[in-house]
Amino acid sequence: MDLPAGITKAGESITGEEWRILGHIYHAKHECDSSFSFETYDPAGTFVPPHIHTTQDEFIYVLEGRFDLYLDGQWTQAHPGDLVRMPKGVPHGYYNKTDKPSRALFWVSPAGKLKNLFEQLHDLTDPDEVVKRSAAHDVDFLPPDAVKGG
């Protein structure tokens, strides 16, 4: 898929879709063969547990709030203006441990199956089903007891 020229407005999706996944809200910002980006809205107390992208590098550009991150075996924080780099195969997860929402622009390269995964996860409430469907789309979650601290 080629990249179309244009602007995707803040808080909107290039496709008009909004995905709600376990408390988070995602808007697709662009999609082409080489990459896929999405804006996240993460209410206070939400998180995405540690996982690995087996075929994609992932990035987070923090727009608002604070991200507590598990990244390659270490705990760290990212703030507005920070860019987080998560190479493929490196365990990572993010948490909003504050009392305010956070927002960020995420993107992966190559695009892979992530957009299709979000379409399948929309409105699911069963975390086990999220893990199962994610694995079929090259995203492998770590076991809950695999990460200490944080």
Question: At which residue positions do the language-model features occur?
Answer:
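Acidic/histidine-enriched, glycine/proline-rich intrinsically disordered or flexible terminal extensions
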Residues: 115-150
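Hydrophobic small-molecule pocket/channel-lining residues, especially in calycin-type beta-barrels
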Residues: 46, 67, 116
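Conserved hydrophobic/aromatic beta-strand scaffold that supports enzyme active sites
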Residues: 28, 37-39, 59, 75, ...
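Short acidic-glycine-tyrosine-enriched beta hairpin
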Residues: 9, 73-91
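A short glycine-rich, His/Asp/Glu-containing loop-to-beta-strand
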Residues: 15-50, 56
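Basic/polar N-terminal segments that are highly enriched at the extreme N-terminus
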Residues: 1-12, 147-150
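Short, conserved beta-strand element in jelly-roll/cupin
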Residues: 39-43, 52-71, 109
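Ligand-binding loop in jelly-roll beta-barrel domains
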Residues: 68, 88-114
